[in-house]
Amino acid sequence: MPSDRQKKIRNFSIIAHIDHGKSTLADRLIEYTGLISQREMQSQMLDNMDLERERGITIKLQTIRLVYKAKDGEEYYLNLIDTPGHVDFTYEVSRSLAACEGAVLIVDAAQGIEAQTLANVYLALEQDLEIIPVINKIDLPSARPDEIKTEIEDIIGLDASEAPLISAKEGLNIEDVLESIVKNVPSPKGDINAPLKALIFDSYYDSYKGVIAYMRVMEGQVKKGMKVKMMATNKEFEVVEVGAFSPGAIPLDSLSAGDVGYLAASIKDVRHCRVGDTITDALNPTESPLPGYRKVNPMVYCGIYPAEGEKYEDIRDALEKLQVNDAALVFEPESSAALGFGFRCGFLGLLHMEIIQERLEREFDLDLITTAPSVIYKITKTNGEELMIQNPANMPTPQEIRIMEEPIVKTTIMVPNTYVGAVMELCQDRRGEMKDMQYIDDTRVNLYYEMPLNEVIYDFFDALKSKTKGYGSLDYELLGYRASDLVKLDILINGEQIDALSFIVHESKAYSRGKGMCEKLKDEIPRHQFPIPLQAAVGNKVISRETIKALRKDVLAKCYGGDISRKKKLLEKQKEGKKRMRQVGNVEVPQKAFMSVLKLDN
C-alpha cells in the first residue's frame, strides 16, 4: 500500500525536440513554485555547464525537487528530471525516463511534431509512462495550436483535447502544466519496508565527496551510514550523505521508495558507479536488479593528440575526469608517427565528440589535435580471420582483405514536403537506400533510408538542416553491417605516408576526397626550399597530386646582361642543390594543417 507521503510525489521528465522550449519550461516551473527568487533566476537553470547554456542544448541530466501547492490545497513534491534532446544522447533519455512515472511532451505550436519528438515518445511509451502533451510557443504569430492538437492525436495517438497551451518564454498558463502533472501522473508505487532497490540514472564527480550518484529509489529506503552494494560491479560502500536537489544539494536524513535524490558514499572510481546500475542494501540485498540498462557502445572514434607543448599525461587525466561524468566515453592510448602519443576515443556521435573536445579545451585548458572521425569496420581476411577496425592505420593490406563491411543505420528523416526532392538527392549522394516514404499529413513526410553510418557522422545533420531551411529533423539507429567497396586513402607528403591523415572511404568518393585533401594541404603547408609533392594514394596507386613550389633565391640577380651559359650554369647549380636538399630535407607539417584538413567537409 503506498504511504501518504508517496501519494504526494510525482516523478516526471520533460521530453521534446531540440529547441522546442524544454529548458525554458523547466525554468518557468522552478520560478512558479517559488523555488528560486526572481533575482537568482538565470535562464536554463538546469543546464549548468557553460557549454550547455551557450549552445542552448542540454547535455547532462539534471534533477530538481519542486514543492507545489495545488488547487486542492495539498502540497505535492514534484521531481523534475531534465533530459537531453539530441539524437546522440538517446541513451541518457531512456535512463531518465526509467526513473519517472510520467512525461511532459512539449510540442512547438509552430513547427509541430519532429523526428526526435517521436523517437523520445516511443522511448517513454516503452517504459509505460503517462504522457502529458503540452503545446508551447503559443505567443508566436505562426502558432497553430488546434492543428497541432489534431496532429498529436493522429501521429502519436494521444488525446490532446485538454493539452495546456502555454508560452514558456512569456510564462503563460504555467499553472495548467503543474495541475496537469498532479492530476495525470501516477504517484510512485513501491514498498518502503522491502529491501532497498534504487536506480542510478546519472552520476558526477565531486572533488570532495567522490562520485555522487543521482538515483530514484524504487523500493525500501536509504539512510546515512548504511552499507550499500552496486549490483553490476558487486562493490560495497558506506553512505556518507543522501539528499535532494532543490536546486542545490540539500542533505536529508533518508530517501524512501518513490524519492529522487542523490547519494554520496566516498566512491573514488566512477566505473564502480555505472549509470543504470541498481543500488541495494549490502546486508539485506534485493533479489534481482532493475531491468533495462545496457553498456553504451560508442559509434564514432577519433584520435586525440596533444598539440605542441601539451603533455600526454594531462590529456589522460582530463579524459579520466570526463569519463567520471560521462559513462559513454571510452579511450585507449595509441601512437602515431606524425603526431606522437595520444588517445583513440570513442563517442556516441558527432555532437558528443565535439562536446568532449570543447570540454577538454575549456575545462582543462588543453590544446588538442583531433584526427578525422571514423566508425568501426568489420574486415574478413582471406584466411577467414575477422577483425574490427576503427583506426585506418591498423587496416591490413588490400591483398589480405576478402570482405570489408561497414555499419549501416536506419534513418528516419522528417521534412516538410516542399523539401523532399532536395533531401532525397542528399541521401542518394550519401549512398542512402530509400526504404519507405510516408505522408504524415498534407505538409510533412517521413522518409526512411538505410545509410552507411560513415556518411551520417560527418556532416549529414548540418547538410540536412541547410537543405530544409532548418525544418528537417533526423533520428537514427544502428541496423548492422553490410559489405561495401571501401578503400583506405593515404596521404603522402614528400613521398612519406602521414598516418594521422589516412582514412577509410567509399571507392566512389576516394578521388574527390583525396583531391580535396591535397588542395587543402597545399594551402596550409608553408613553402620550403625544395618542391614538395602531396599525393593521395589508394594502395600503390596515386589518384591525385599537388605540388608545393619551392622557395628560391634569385641566383641571377648578380648577372648583368652577359652570357646565357653563365646564367644556365648558375641555374643548374641551384637545381642540383635543391635536388640534394629534397632527398635529405624533411617537411614540417604545421598543426594548423592537420586541423584544417580534418575539418574538411564533404
From Swiss-Prot:
Main EC class the enzyme belongs to: hydrolase
Location of the tr-type G domain: 7-189
Which CDD domains does this one have? EF4_II, EF4_III, LepA, lepA_C
The Gene Ontology biological process terms listed for this entry are:
positive regulation of translation
Q: Which SMART domains match?
A: EFG_C
Entry keyword annotation includes Hydrolase: yes
What's its membrane topology? Peripheral membrane protein
State the superkingdom.
Bacteria
* Locations listed in the record: Cell membrane
> Which keywords, in A-to-Z order, does the entry hold?
Cell membrane, GTP-binding, Hydrolase, Membrane, Nucleotide-binding, Protein biosynthesis
Q: Name one GO molecular function term.
A: ribosome binding
Q: A GO CC term?
A: plasma membrane
Question: Catalysed reaction per UniProt?
Answer: GTP + H2O = GDP + phosphate + H(+)
**Per UniProt, where does GTP bind?**
19-24, 136-139
Entry EC no(s):
3.6.5.n1
Q: Which Pfam families match?
A: EFG_C (PF00679), GTP_EFTU (PF00009), GTP_EFTU_D2 (PF03144), LepA_C (PF06421)
SUPFAM superfamilies annotated for this entry?
Answer: EF-G C-terminal domain-like (SSF54980), P-loop containing nucleoside triphosphate hydrolases (SSF52540), Translation proteins (SSF50447)
Alphabetized HAMAP family for the sequence: LepA
- Give the protein's biological function: Required for accurate and efficient protein synthesis under certain stress conditions. May act as a fidelity factor of the translation reaction, by catalyzing a one-codon backward translocation of tRNAs on improperly translocated ribosomes. Back-translocation proceeds from a post-translocation (POST) complex to a pre-translocation (PRE) complex, thus giving elongation factor G a second chance to translocate the tRNAs correctly. Binds to ribosomes in a GTP-dependent manner.
Q: Which family does it belong to?
A: Belongs to the TRAFAC class translation factor GTPase superfamily. Classic translation factor GTPase family. LepA subfamily.
Q: What is this protein called?
A: Elongation factor 4
Organism of this sequence: Alkaliphilus oremlandii (strain OhILAs) (Clostridium oremlandii (strain OhILAs))
